[in-house]
């Protein structure tokens, strides 16, 4: 790390912060700054703050980074770097930390003196996060003090001030995405976990912690071997061609190159690539350079050693890369990104640098490891022969006509429209659902292809074997665009390919097989957004003459809350009335309160939590020795089962209170982190209702004397008189219901399949469908308790 520190010699102070312009525009045009206001943009807020923490690690200062998703979907990111500067900026007269969070583009990334390898301008978005957050709190641990500052929708509400002393250093940023801006504010654990794990592979010197208070999950990532362990992870369940994971590292013209790769007994090339910790989904010059360097090294060494004598035609670079899994990670001083998603590296000099580092290393490596070279060459020869065989197989299949243009499978119920952009095809599981779908469809533009036979497990099959399967043959001939290298999107007969399967395990399995097939053999269809999954409803709800279809449990809860909004009210003991939106907000708060209280009890025990709440113990109490003494005395009096001790925590500048339960042999610690947690603060503030309360719904009335019963009672009232049907499969619906819920473009829901995470999907498919039993068993055991319906 000393080497990296020497590349960032300038002091990180207020003068290192450069300001470009003000913040006015961000809330009006958020998509200009974060891409969109949907799920992607929402998570982009986390990446902006996380990237700042990682830049501190890359510069050689941070060793620990933690991300916490709180129960209200707010997020905290903390690092132990230098801490954002708090001194007054010479030009603006404001603290530097205030500039970072209130002035667009104020940051230390414009001048490479402070950060040599930041992700372009990714790290300067703290002000954008602030502008798009309902609230944001920043704490800086620097020079032995804890500095705190708070904002609301980008405006300062709590100026920078000192709240305590500490031996810690670093920055802690907590923020809650603004529901006035975003379509959804639900943070997805899987999305955050994937990014944090990715960063942990790329930064082996840093320990990452991820906590989700909603799910009770806590994960720690520290990968000492870095991207070698990512290669191992991607190859889980696959059989390696040779044991070694080959590692190439080098530096030239300020570009740092780090590559790890291994071959497996498979037919696909997988390359994951990164520049300055940013995933380059579309690859770029660094990937081109690696491919070229690898292919040249293998082909030239094979020719020199006459390893491919039996091959009439020479093998190609593509043959060399069959079965390759590689991770290419580069650090580039001034990266230029291009492509649709701005995730393709365009710097031309990087191609030559990566190619020469790769070629030089491998020629030397293969000299010493002839057995590894021989294994790669034999696999490339096999790939070249298979390529020729596949070509012949496709020609043979075409001659036999099922894939010939214009010849359609007999079971296809086609549509009359000939413009592909207006046509859609439903791939429907089973005969019964297929029959209903044929009756339900709009024949003008909707085609139905029932799939009744066994779909081949394409995990281990090459294209010639895949094409011998009747169901696959029917799909390929119906779509009309060819398969594999021959796929021509201009010949595609339908621009919406919709997978329609049951929500049960069998349906999920068939959907998985179909998705695997598209990923492996027709990836362009997924890349261009032609593949969709139908989302039939889970419930049909009928009340009187009113009948509606509901997608899932969450939507059902929203539906019931809407009923309560219209028909319910609550009056507390002081005759304060709640109705409409105010009542719904109160019920959501009550549910959150109960969930938070249960989480606290699970963490620290009921007696202890009740004591802390009764005596209103707060974070600042632990910084006051007299108050700590008072609290411990009260504990000894009221909680006879515990032995109480205290210990001064120099890092936090506060006391820890430690409880020993000698009967159970357990130890519980109450510290400032627990008392400052969102869950504890939420429960401590409580719900301001005076009991008992009167609950009214339509003509019903009941008196309730417990906060915990109010939400459930309203839900029971809202459900009464409803006829609720839960669907298990498509076959349970008649044609009219199937049309209304799943096929009518005006009322249905479709989910577009994205290829963004093709490598992860590929990995899961391999574990679930590959030949190695042990990884599959481990995967199913790990997830069986967490999922009700296995889905992809």
Swiss-Prot record:
Per UniProt, the cofactor note for this protein states:
Binds two Mg(2+) per subunit. The magnesium ions form salt bridges with both the protein and the DNA. Can also accept other divalent metal cations, such as Mn(2+) or Ca(2+).
Q: Report if keyword Cytoplasm is assigned.
A: yes
Q: Return one Gene Ontology term, BP aspect.
A: DNA topological change
Q: What is its EC number?
A: 5.6.2.2
List locations, semicolon-separated.
Cytoplasm
Positions binding Mg(2+) 2 in this chain are: 502, 504
EC class of the enzyme, as a word: isomerase
Thermal dependence: Optimum temperature is 70 degrees Celsius, active between 37 and 90 degrees Celsius.
Give the Toprim domain ranges. Answer: 423-537
Q: What is this protein called?
A: Type 2 topoisomerase subunit B
């Amino acid at each position: 790390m000393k080497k990296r520190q020497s590349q960032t010699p300038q002091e990180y102070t207020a003068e290192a912060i450069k300001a470009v312009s003000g913040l006015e525009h961000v809330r009006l045009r958020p998509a200009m700054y974060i891409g969109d206001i949907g799920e992607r943009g929402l998570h982009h807020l986390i990446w902006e703050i996380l990237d700042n923490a990682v830049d501190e690690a890359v510069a050689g200062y941070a060793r620990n980074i933690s991300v916490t998703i709180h129960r209200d979907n707010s997020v905290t990111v903390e690092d132990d770097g230098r801490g954002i500067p708090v001194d007054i900026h010479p030009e603006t007269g404001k603290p530097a930390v205030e500039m970072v969070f209130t002035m667009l583009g104020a940051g230390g990334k414009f001048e490479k003196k402070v950060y040599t390898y930041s992700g372009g301008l990714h790290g300067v978005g703290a002000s954008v996060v602030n502008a798009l957050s309902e609230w944001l709190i920043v704490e800086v641990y620097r020079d032995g003090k804890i500095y705190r500052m708070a904002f609301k929708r980008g405006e300062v509400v709590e100026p920078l001030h000192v709240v305590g002393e500490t031996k810690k250093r670093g920055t802690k940023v907590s923020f809650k995405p603004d529901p006035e801006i975003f379509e959804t504010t639900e943070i997805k654990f899987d999305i955050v976990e994937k990014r944090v794990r990715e960063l942990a592979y790329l930064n082996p010197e840093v320990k990452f912690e991820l906590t989700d208070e909603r799910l009770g999950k806590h994960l720690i990532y520290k990968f000492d071997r870095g991207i070698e362990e990512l290669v191992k992870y991607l190859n889980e369940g696959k059989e390696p061609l040779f044991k070694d994971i080959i590692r190439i590292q080098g530096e030239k013209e300020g570009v740092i190159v780090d590559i790890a790769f291994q071959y497996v007994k498979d037919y696909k090339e997988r390359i994951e690539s990164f520049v300055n910790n940013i995933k380059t989904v579309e690859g770029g010059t660094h990937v081109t350079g690696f491919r070229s360097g690898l292919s040249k090294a293998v082909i030239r060494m094979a020719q020199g050693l006459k390893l491919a004598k039996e091959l009439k035609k020479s093998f190609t670079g593509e043959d060399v890369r069959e079965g390759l899994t590689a991770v290419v990670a580069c650090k580039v001083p001034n990266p230029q990104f291009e492509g649709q998603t701005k995730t393709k590296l365009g710097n031309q000099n990087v191609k030559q640098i990566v190619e020469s580092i790769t070629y030089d290393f491998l020629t030397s490596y293969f000299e010493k490891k002839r057995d590894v070279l021989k294994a790669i060459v034999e696999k490339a020869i096999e790939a070249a022969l298979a390529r020729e065989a596949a070509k012949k197989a496709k020609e043979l299949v075409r001659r036999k006509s099922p894939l010939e243009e214009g010849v359609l499978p007999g079971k296809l119920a086609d549509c009359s429209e000939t413009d592909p952009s207006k046509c859609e095809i439903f791939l429907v599981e089973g005969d019964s659902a297929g029959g209903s779908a044929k009756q339900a469809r709009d024949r003008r533009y909707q085609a139905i292809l029932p799939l009744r036979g066994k779909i081949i497990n394409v995990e281990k099959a090459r294209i010639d074997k895949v094409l011998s399967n009747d169901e696959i043959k029917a799909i390929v001939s119906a779509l009309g665009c060819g398969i594999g290298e021959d796929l021509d999107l201009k010949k595609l007969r339908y621009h919406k390919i919709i997978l329609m399967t049951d929500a049960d395990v069998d349906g999920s399995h068939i959907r998985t097989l179909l998705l695997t097939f598209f990923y492996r053999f027709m990836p362009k269809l997924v890349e261009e957004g032609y593949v969709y999954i139908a989302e039939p409803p889970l419930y049909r709800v009928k009340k009187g003459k009113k009948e509606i279809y509901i997608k899932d449990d969450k939507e059902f809860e929203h539906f019931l809350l809407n009923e309560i909004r219209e028909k319910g009210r609550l009056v507390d003991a002081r005759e304060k009335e709640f109705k409409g939106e105010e009542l719904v907000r109160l019920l959501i708060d009550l549910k959150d309160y109960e969930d938070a209280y249960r989480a606290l009890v699970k963490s620290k025990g009921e007696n202890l939590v009740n004591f802390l709440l009764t005596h209103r113990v707060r974070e600042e109490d632990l910084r006051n020795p007299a108050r700590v003494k008072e609290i411990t005395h009260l504990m000894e009096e009221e909680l006879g089962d515990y032995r109480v001790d205290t210990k001064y925590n120099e890092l936090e500048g506060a006391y820890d209170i430690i409880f020993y339960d000698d009967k159970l042999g357990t130890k519980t610690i109450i510290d400032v982190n627990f008392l400052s947690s969102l869950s504890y603060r939420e429960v401590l503030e409580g719900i301001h209702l005076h009991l008992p309360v009167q609950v009214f719904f339509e003509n019903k009335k009941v008196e309730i004397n417990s906060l915990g019963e109010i939400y459930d009672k309203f839900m029971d009232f809202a459900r009464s008189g409803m006829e609720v049907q839960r669907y298990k499969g498509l076959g349970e619906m008649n044609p009219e219901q199937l049309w209304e819920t799943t096929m009518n473009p005006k009322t249905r829901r479709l989910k577009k399949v994205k290829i963004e995470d093709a490598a992860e999907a590929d990995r899961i498919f391999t574990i679930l469908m590959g030949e190695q039993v042990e990884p599959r068993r481990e995967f199913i055991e790990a997830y069986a308790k967490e999922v009700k319906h296995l889905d992809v």
